[in-house]
């Protein structure tokens, strides 16, 4: 049984169904963040693998409402469905979670059509991990960004190198928002942690910046660094 960083409240408990690559990583990350996690899978090998890493792990058929009730899933306010390849099991699991009263359901989808079906049977949040990762990698390959995250509304955050003309100047003096429309969120110098950006923050040569803005603004800024 995994030990948590803090004692979780009931609202912080999460059930993760499907302990493959995606679901397992989500579950493990939630435990590290201090949440109580119930892992559910019908594969005994996966159940055994995760038994020492998660708070609780059980073997059960997630498409069966009675089975979910018996293992205590109905007591969890939030669920993540990490089943991807078996679309029928994915949909039936979301439906079963809805029927037993789980309030908030996150579900992995492998296609837009799959995602629409998941929403129609009760998933409030649909995740497309392969598509999101593919788009992220494409941005990194075709730009000078070091890391990139894009949100659904066209807003993006990127890690990129500071422009050469920024060296030794304050953020207020550089005026990146005026020039590019981006907001500098953090600044990192070699050998130091990121610090929150302020107008008076000086940008040493070779610094790394965390910037936020529209996807177009962030891309334009990264291209200029």
Q: How would you label these PLM feature ranges?
A:
Residues 1-225:
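Cytosolic regulatory regions of ion transport systems
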């Amino acid at each position: 049984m995994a030990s948590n960083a803090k004692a979780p409240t009931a609202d912080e408990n999460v059930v993760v169904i499907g302990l493959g690559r995606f679901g397992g990583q989500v579950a493990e990350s939630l435990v590290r963040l201090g949440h109580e996690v119930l892992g559910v899978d019908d594969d005994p090998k996966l159940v055994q693998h995760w038994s020492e890493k998660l708070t609780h792990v059980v073997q059960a058929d997630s498409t069966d409402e009675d089975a979910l009730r018996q293992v205590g899933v109905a007591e969890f306010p939030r669920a993540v469905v990490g089943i991807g390849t078996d679309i029928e099991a994915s949909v039936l699991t979301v439906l079963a979670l809805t029927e037993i009263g789980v309030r908030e359901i996150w579900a992995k989808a492998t296609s837009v059509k799959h995602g629409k079906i998941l929403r129609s049977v009760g998933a409030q949040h649909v995740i497309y991990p392969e598509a999101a990762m593919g788009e992220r990698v494409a941005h990194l390959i075709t730009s000078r960004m070091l890391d990139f995250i894009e949100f659904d509304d066209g807003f993006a955050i990127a890690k990129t190198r500071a422009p050469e003309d920024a060296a030794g100047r304050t953020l207020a003096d550089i005026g990146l928002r005026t020039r590019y429309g981006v907001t500098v969120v953090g600044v990192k110098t070699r050998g130091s942690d990121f610090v929150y950006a302020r107008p008076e923050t000086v940008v040493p040569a070779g610094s790394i910046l965390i910037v936020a803005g529209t996807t177009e603004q962030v891309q334009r800024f990264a291209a200029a660094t």
